[in-house]
Amino acid sequence: MATFKDACYHYKRLNKLNHAVLKLGVNDAWRPSPPTKYKGWCLDCCQHTDLTYCRGCSIYHVCQWCNQYGRCFLDDEPHLLRMRTFKNDITKEDLANLIDMYNVLFPVNQKIVNKFINNTKQHKCRNELVPQWYNHLLMPITLQSLSIELSGDIYYIFGYYDDMKNVNQTPFSFVNLIDIYDRLLLDDVNFNRMSFLPLVLQQEYAIRYFSKSRFISEEKRQINHSHFSINILENLHNPNFKIQITRNCSTMFGKWNEACTLVKDIGTYFEILKTSHVEFYDVSPRCRMFTQHKLKAVSKVIKPNYATSNHRALATEVYNCRWCSVNTSFIVWNDFRLRNICDNVLNFIRALVKSNTRIGHCSSQEQIHSYIRDVFDVCDENKWNTSVSGIFNCLESVELDGVHYVLLNHEVNWDVANVLIQNIGKIPQILTLNDVITALHSMIYDWFDIRYMRNTPTTTFTVDKLRQLCARRKIADYDSGLSDVE
């Protein structure tokens, strides 16, 4: 059983404040939720289990039980998860406020300990002090947290997470912030709590405390597209697709890291709860992460042999050719922008091949084919530059005064011609490597200009940022029919 979950269940009965704050979905009646996918720690109840995606940010970080309350660590409502979430630069005073909140919600004194022991002993065969029956009393106060970086902000979600060595398939990594506070002060807080426990339970408490307060922080994990809801990934190739998210909001004022201080003023806390409401947002999935996922999908299904072929048709419209026909039933081709990029890039590369080499048929096995797939993933700059340089080196360039040149005297389609005119000023007959790079960049940037894209989707924005974008009518970014250039 998860220690934090048990503590919330038992301490919820102490008073009105605890009943409001410590209410977890995992301790209530179960309701149906989306299928689970990843193994990790539920941020709401801190247990290690199968996770489903959060309705607030679309990241897998909530269990199927807690999902019914729809809480997200990015909410603007002072529920327990939000009050345990800190952002960016954390001070010693912030951590002191967190410890005070733990002491308010999970007090340990002689009266509390006796009450829980008496309640437990009312059941048959529970006269012994077995740790599993007193799990709620054995939750030490630590500065253990799960951390994630989103849109330049670093979030720390504090809690008591059991079994830290278990499988972690989430983008969250364990971070220990005890050095920002003070080891001796935290030891004193826990030794004081431990002194009220029976001797048998003190040993278990001490083991748990030191194992969770002296660990070495993990390396930061990189968030990627697979950490988001599968529903998003399945619909990315629909240009009109919008992600629907919900956020719990209230009239909560003050700095982000001061939310945990609200439990010290019960009256103010309940006044804020009266203003609680849910806000709905339809946001664009447009971001560097998902764009790279789409471009990689294109690179897997294209036919590099088209670059050495003589077909009159565009790359995505070739049929009945063993080497060049693409499977148009793949979902990736539902996005007309990806079709356009594929057609233009391969048309341009083919024009370069025909202008500079004697390769005459798509059945030829040429070295240049091995570089073509990577030319679509413009997000991976190093691999992309290597790919373009490899293609250029296969074109039998001519060196003049230390600069290599290639010819362009083969026909190109109208889209490619327009790209060359816009970026070079005309349709050139001689190109340098930089000209080739500029042209290929432009064909992709016309639709997906990653230079001006955020790394993660807007689902990872705070409520304040979402409201600002909504007010400026930029929450859905661009109309799907317009390119970045337009």
From Swiss-Prot:
Motif segment (IKBKB-like degron (ILD) motif): 479-483
What species is given as this protein's source? Rotavirus A (strain RVA/Pig/Mexico/YM/1983/G11P9[7]) (RV-A)
Swiss-Prot/TrEMBL domain comment:
The integrity of the zinc-binding domain in NSP1 is important for degradation of host IRF3.
- Protein location: Host cytoplasm, Host cytoskeleton
Query: Is the keyword Calcium assigned to this protein?
Result: no
Q: Which cysteines are joined by disulfide bonds?
A: none
Q: Could you tell me the keywords of this UniProt record?
A: Host cytoplasm, Host cytoskeleton, Host-virus interaction, Inhibition of host innate immune response by virus, Inhibition of host IRF3 by virus, Inhibition of host IRF7 by virus, Inhibition of host NF-kappa-B by virus, Inhibition of host RLR pathway by virus, Interferon antiviral system evasion, Metal-binding, Phosphoprotein, RNA-binding, Viral immunoevasion
- Taxonomy-wise, where does this protein's organism fall, top ranks first? Viruses, Riboviria, Orthornavirae, Duplornaviricota, Resentoviricetes
UniProt protein name = Non-structural protein 1
- Please tell me where this protein is predominantly located: host cell
**Which modifications occur after translation, per UniProt?**
The C-terminal region is phosphorylated by host CKII/CSNK2A1. Phosphorylation of the DSGXS motif is essential for host NF-kappa-B inhibition.
Question: What does the protein in this record do?
Answer: Plays a role in the inhibition of host innate immunity by inducing the degradation of key host factors required to activate interferon production such as IRF3, IRF5 or IRF7. Associates with components of cullin RING ligases (CRLs) including CUL1 or CUL3, which are essential multisubunit ubiquitination complexes, to modulate their activities. Recognizes the host NF-kappa-B regulator BTRC through the presence of a DSGXS motif in the C-terminal substrate recognition domain.
Region RNA-binding, residue ranges: 1-81
Q: Which HAMAP family match?
A: ROTA_NSP1
Q: Which InterPro entries is this protein grouped with?
A: Rotavirus_NSP1
